[in-house]
Every structure is written in structure tokens, then in C-alpha cells.
Amino acid sequence: MTTSFYDLECKDKKGESFKFDQLKGKVVLIVNVASKCGFTPQYKELEELYKKYQDKGFVILGFPCNQFGKQEPGSDEQITEFCQLNYGVTFPIMKKIDVNGSNADSVYNYLKSQKAGLLGFKGIKWNFEKFLVDSNGKVVQRFSSLTKPSSLDQEIQSLLSK
């Protein structure tokens, strides 16, 4: 079991290793995403947050997942193209993963172990659940799919000013 956020590693959309130790000192928002979901328009607000704060040490990592209503059926290339064409996404989109179950990615196993959801439920309930990590690698908040990215603005500002 991973003991530190910075020990985590995943694959980027090209299948290359992405080590979380490069995120030290940054505020990070991690979101499981999907292209064919009612919450898909959240990409727009996520991109706005990223553009607003990326120069101040803020990063968003999007993790495509097809576990909820099969709403992310595309290949990694198709997902990237969709995000760029429809929402102008410039924040990193990682390789498609599972977030729940026996094949769940280690990133999500770690996040869920650090911050349970509503009523202590650890599993991810739907697309566009969000985890906010401070600049010391502590998972400080978990937000449901219903939480609009724009509503996280003050929280992100506060973490960036610490």
C-alpha cells in the first residue's frame, strides 16, 4: 500500500510513466472523467480553473473511466481529441483506468483510502468525482459529481496561498 501521494505513479495518455513526485509543492485536483456523461460539460469549468491557476502552482489530472454507464468507450486518442475539440482542454488527461473494483488503479485506491465520500462510502459513485490535494500531498477534500468545478475556486485560492 502506498503511504504517500508522492509515491504514486500512473500512465499518461501515451502509456508513459507519470510520477507524482513531480507534483511536490503543487495543489492538485484529480477527477475521473467521461465524454458521454451529463456532467461532461464540467470540462469547461475545469479548464477555466486550470488556466486561472496553473501559473500559481495548480494542476488538474483527468482520469478517463468507463465504469459508470459505459460513458467513456473511446480509445485514449479519441478521448484526448474529444476533450481538445469540444472543451479546449489543456490540463493532463491520463490513460483510461478503473477507479473501483479489483482492477482499480493504485492512484484511486490511495485517494479513496485517504478521503471517504458521503456517509463514509469509499467507492467512487459516478463520473466527475473530485479529490483536492494540498501542496504537501495531503488529500484535503473530496467532492461529488454534483459539485461544480467553479465552486472550488476559493478553496483552491486558499490552498495556493499557504
Curated annotation (Swiss-Prot):
Its EC number is 1.11.1.24. InterPro entries: Glutathione_peroxidase, GPX_AS, GPX_CS, Thioredoxin-like_sf. It comes from the Eukaryota. It holds the Pfam family GSHPx. The keyword Mitochondrion applies. One of its GO terms (molecular function) is glutathione peroxidase activity. It is found in: Cytoplasm; Nucleus; Mitochondrion outer membrane; Mitochondrion inner membrane. One of its GO terms (cellular component) is mitochondrial outer membrane. The active site is at C37. It catalyses: a hydroperoxide + [thioredoxin]-dithiol = an alcohol + [thioredoxin]-disulfide + H2O. Induction: By oxidative stress, dependent on transcription factor YAP1. By oleic acid. SUPFAM superfamilies: Thioredoxin-like. It is a peripheral membrane protein. GO terms for biological process: cellular response to oxidative stress. It is an enzyme of class 1 (oxidoreductase). Disulfide bonds join C37-C83. CDD domains: GSH_Peroxidase. Keywords: Antioxidant, Cytoplasm, Disulfide bond, Membrane, Mitochondrion, Mitochondrion inner membrane, Mitochondrion outer membrane, Nucleus, Oxidoreductase, Peroxidase, Redox-active center. Monomer. Glutathione peroxidase-like protein that protects cells from phospholipid hydroperoxides and nonphospholipid peroxides during oxidative stress. Plays an important role in the oxidative stress-induced response in the presence of Ca(2+). Has peroxidase activity using preferentially thioredoxin as a reducing power. The redox state of the mitochondrial GPX2 is regulated by TRX1 and TRX2 (cytoplasmic thioredoxin), and by TRX3 (mitochondrial matrix thioredoxin). Involved in sporulation. Belongs to the glutathione peroxidase family. Present with 2010 molecules/cell in log phase SD medium. The active site is a conserved redox-active cysteine residue, the peroxidatic cysteine (C(P)), which makes the nucleophilic attack on the peroxide substrate. The peroxide oxidizes the C(P)-SH to cysteine sulfenic acid (C(P)-SOH), which then reacts with another cysteine residue, the resolving cysteine (C(R)), to form a disulfide bridge. The disulfide is subsequently reduced by an appropriate electron donor to complete the catalytic cycle. In this atypical 2-Cys peroxiredoxin, C(R) is present in the same subunit to form an intramolecular disulfide. This is Glutathione peroxidase-like peroxiredoxin 2. It comes from Saccharomyces cerevisiae (strain ATCC 204508 / S288c).
